[in-house]
Amino acid sequence: MKKYNYDRLKDAYRQFSAAETEYMKACNQDDEQNQWEKEEILNACTDILTVTVKDVLEDEEDFIQ
């Protein structure tokens, strides 16, 4: 795997993991607005991670062929 792709995956996963942690913390509070905001951030990070994985797989596939 190219280092560039590894770094992209690592960064996207780091962002997702941090957002997931913040969302879980928010779920333990009574502040519904905060929960909603953290869920929106988590959803965005999930989308970013999904797109990054797709892009990296396509790039690595091109690299292998």
Each language-model region and where it sits:
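Short, charge-rich amphipathic interface segments used for partner binding and complex assembly
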Residues: A18-Q65
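N-terminal acidic leader/helix
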Residues: M1-N28
